[in-house]
């Protein structure tokens, strides 16, 4: 009787695990599905031809915006700069 109870519990645990879709890989917070829901966007592909569906609203909350600062480099005019000129070949000449 106890063996039957253990088997039933294990059966329901195994079924509950398979009901949830698999998570996406490579640190993407989403699920692998055949079709994404209306509020989801597909970030990248999953295995077996499925899409990695990410909730767009949740993704915006957790995404941190970083400001990219470009440093302006003043070029020294005393330095010599090299240029390489590549030869070109004209196949057709179009006259208008």
Swiss-Prot record:
Compartments (UniProt record): Secreted
Keyword entries, A-Z: Antibiotic, Antimicrobial, Defensin, Disulfide bond, Secreted, Signal
Signal peptide: 1-21
Membrane-spanning residues: none
Principal location class: secreted
InterPro entries: Beta-defensin, Beta_defensin_dom
Single biological process term from Gene Ontology: innate immune response
Superkingdom of the organism of origin: Eukaryota
GO cellular component: extracellular region
Cysteines paired by S-S bonds: 24-52, 32-46, 36-53
PANTHER family, sorted: BETA-DEFENSIN 123, BETA-DEFENSIN 123-RELATED
Protein family membership: Belongs to the beta-defensin family.
Biological function: Has antibacterial activity.
This protein's name: Beta-defensin 20
């Amino acid at each position: 009787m106890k063996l039957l109870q253990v088997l039933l519990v294990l059966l329901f645990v195994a079924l509950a695990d398979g009901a949830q879709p698999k998570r996406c890989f490579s640190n993407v917070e989403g699920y692998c599905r055949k079709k994404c829901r209306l509020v989801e966007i597909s970030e990248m592909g999953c295995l077996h031809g499925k899409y990695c569906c990410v909730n767009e609203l949740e993704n915006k909350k957790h995404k941190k915006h970083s400001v990219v600062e470009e440093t302006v480099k003043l070029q020294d005019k005393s330095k010599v700069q090299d240029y390489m000129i590549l030869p070109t070949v004209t196949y057709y000449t179009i006259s208008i």
